Amino acid sequence: MGLPFQIEYGQTTGRPELIEDALRQFSAALALTADAGGLYVHGYDESRNQRWANPASGKSPAIWARAVGWLAMALVDALVILPDDSATAELRERTRRLLAGIIARQTQAGLWMQVLDNQGLAGNYAETSASAMFAYALLRAARLGLLRGEEAKAALSAGRQALAALLETRLELDEQGVARLTGIVHVAGLGGFDGNYRDGTPDYYLTEPVVSDDAKGVGPLMMAYAESLLLAR
């Protein structure tokens, strides 16, 4: 999440080594967490000591939508401010494939599931914050030319559908008439926390509390809506 800021800092201060470092970090993270289905798992343990880590690959066992949402936003935010050259070519291709994979997993209702790659999992649900993150990443990638042609059209369609679904189904008025953004998973992680061990299985991600008005959902929704306004200019 911090790498787009590192890149901008490197650009502003004339320190290209910071940009090169950020690109290496992106590439390493993608290589270590890539899933056979074209998405990215939540975590990686080089030591393989954590119980959630696959003993062969070190990867966690499930694809959590919000983790992919953070990744998609970071990749898009970084690439739209970098030159389209050989230094970023591989990362751009990986990002295009990721965005295509996200579009392919959008539900008919326009949102995305908490466990992203398993819509049929019992108890799985459409999660607000990841859906807002994906809407932002798709709309921004299309608006600023990271995606072109049919890819851009598909991203615009998916992003607009997601934003409309969020505004129509996830904003609810409370008893005082205040609009609340609902359906946001509060937090999820891996390993020990607060006396519990988070094992990273698909079922684990369905046990975390779902809340309203968490900044991790409100912020991306505002960002996605801003992209829609910029596209309408």
From Swiss-Prot:
Gene Ontology biological process: carbohydrate metabolic process
Alphabetized InterPro entries for the sequence: 6-hairpin_glycosidase_sf, 6hp_glycosidase-like_sf, Glyco_hydro_88, PolySaccharide_Degr_Enz
Swiss-Prot/TrEMBL induction comment: By certain acidic polysaccharides found in carrot root extract. This induction may be regulated by the polygalacturonase.
A Pfam family recorded for this sequence: Glyco_hydro_88
Origin superkingdom: Bacteria
Keyword tags: Hydrolase
Family to which the UniProt record says this protein belongs: Belongs to the glycosyl hydrolase 88 family.
Protein name stated in the entry: Protein Atu3128
Lineage, highest ranks first: Bacteria, Pseudomonadati, Pseudomonadota, Alphaproteobacteria, Hyphomicrobiales
